[in-house]
Design a protein with these regions (language model features):
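Asp-based phosphoryl-transfer active-site loop
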Residues: 4-20, 94, 244
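Active-site phosphate-binding/coordination module
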Residues: 22-131
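Surface-exposed amphipathic alpha-helices with a cationic face
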Residues: 28-36, 99, 176, 218-222, ...
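Residue-level signal for inorganic ion chemistry
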Residues: 34, 45, 68, 159, ...
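Short active-site oxyanion
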Residues: 38-42, 61-62, 157-159, 229-230, ...
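Short, structured coil segments at secondary-structure junctions
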Residues: 59-60, 68, 178-179, 246-247, ...
Length: 285
């Protein structure tokens, strides 16, 4: 007997969309199945709302958790339910340290990716914007990001520090002296290689402290009056770990990071490109 699911929450990249930015037709059918059963569907991503708006519309999702939990939006009304931003002090600290250690940094506001040059994830987002015709997302190239922050004081949900070196774990420890920030390390090498720009790298995603997809899903759970025991959460990456672990049914796709598989209720037999998301939906709904 299938468990009664009243909310489906899923990561996007690496879970519904594969690493080459393709979507299995099976996954589209699974999304239609959720909608036909009148079950709310929440997309949960590390990207900002402006980056993700097009795909949210394509999926006809009900709710969006963006920036790894820094922003929650009712996608049917456009109402922002919750937001957290980095303080100017913390943002300047991160940007200054990144430049001191010669790391690439870009930052996310409501509508814009701000960077000194397009490289790594911001280059990926730029290519996908051009490919998919995303009008909601803007890019601003600045001469010096620290100077820009000091002058314009942008409201920033998250900062991303990237390198092709293998030194970010040590840098993360340095940033962790600031207990007002949350730093998530993600490895995009080998089997996790970024296929859109065909490059290996690693990055830190930096948000206000105690903010992640799981905390945002907890907020949404209370907002919708749906107990966590009746939520199906699906993911592949380390920023999905807690929401997969703490939901009634937590699913890791076949090509997920091993840490996610260890806490999941179920690991799909199929890979993302073959419809892993659809397998999870058909098994539990």
């Amino acid at each position: 007997m299938k468990k009664k699911i009243k909310l489906v929450a899923s990561d996007i990249d690496g879970t519904i969309i594969d690493r080459s930015n393709n979507i299995s037709p099976k996954n589209f059918e699974a999304i239609k199945k959720i909608q036909n059963k009148k079950i709310p569907f929440a997309v949960c991503t590390g990207k900002s709302y402006s980056v993700s708006k097009g795909i949210c519309e394509q999926f006809n999702a009900n709710y969006g958790i963006f920036g790894n939990g820094t922003q929650i939006v009712d996608l049917k009304t456009g109402k922002e339910l919750h937001r957290d931003i980095l303080t100017q002090e913390d943002l300047l600290f991160v940007a200054t340290m990144a430049k001191r250690f010669h790391y690439h940094i870009h930052i996310y506001t409501d509508t814009t990716i701000i960077t000194e040059r397009l490289k790594y994830m911001d280059l990926r987002n730029f290519k996908l914007k051009k490919k998919n015709g995303v009008k909601s997302l803007k890019f601003r190239i600045v001469l010096n990001i620290v100077d820009y922050i000091e002058k314009h004081k942008p409201e920033v949900f998250s900062a991303v520090i990237t390198t092709e070196d293998t030194t970010l774990q040590e840098f993360k420890n340095l940033l962790n002296i600031n207990d007002r920030m949350e730093c998530t390390y993600i490895n995009k090498r080998g089997q996790y290689r970024d296929q859109v720009i065909n490059k290996d790298y690693e990055y830190l995603n930096i948000t206000p402290t105690n903010i992640d997809k799981d905390q945002a899903l907890e907020f949404l759970s209370k907002y919708l009056k749906v107990p966590r025991s009746q939520i199906l959460a699906i993911g592949d990456n380390v920023n999905d770990l807690n929401m997969v672990k703490n939901s009634g049914v937590g699913v890791a796709v076949n090509d997920a990071y091993d840490d996610i598989k260890k806490v999941a209720t179920y690991v799909t037999e199929t890979k993302v490109s073959d419809g892993a998301f659809a397998e999870a939906i058909n098994k539990y709904i």
